[in-house]
């Protein structure tokens, strides 16, 4: 049933039609999920944003993204800047995860999943988290397209029942396996 992909909710409020669709999605033969195939990182918790964040870029500072700085498929641009000093923050993931050559950024809180692609090693605050998929033969931008789809929005709303997007939710999203050419076509559509 619905247990093939990770879920943490009950489907008591789903209509028969919705349940049938969720069951069909969960039973897809040619699909994978990210559980065990991705690294996750929380955005930086500075401990004192008023002290550490800048509203304007200055010499030696760099952009840092909030959840509100990303939209589906794109980074709008940073609304804050920071003089990056990893040792002084309340909570920080390994720096290598922020500096990964490519990664997906996602809003931690929102009505629907919002994912953007980053290949500029941009820092993020804790409202903008990181997932780095490592699925052989699957382009990260294709995974972003799937995660921004109305199908995954429906899945998240009906299965996870949460305004927060947790690691366990992302690990359980069904991702259709697609040939390289199909992936490239989908990526072209969303770029």
Q: Where are the regions that the model predicts?
A:
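A short, charged helix-loop
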Residues: 1-2
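Polybasic, glycine- and aromatic-enriched phosphate-binding surface used to engage nucleic acids
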Residues: 11-185
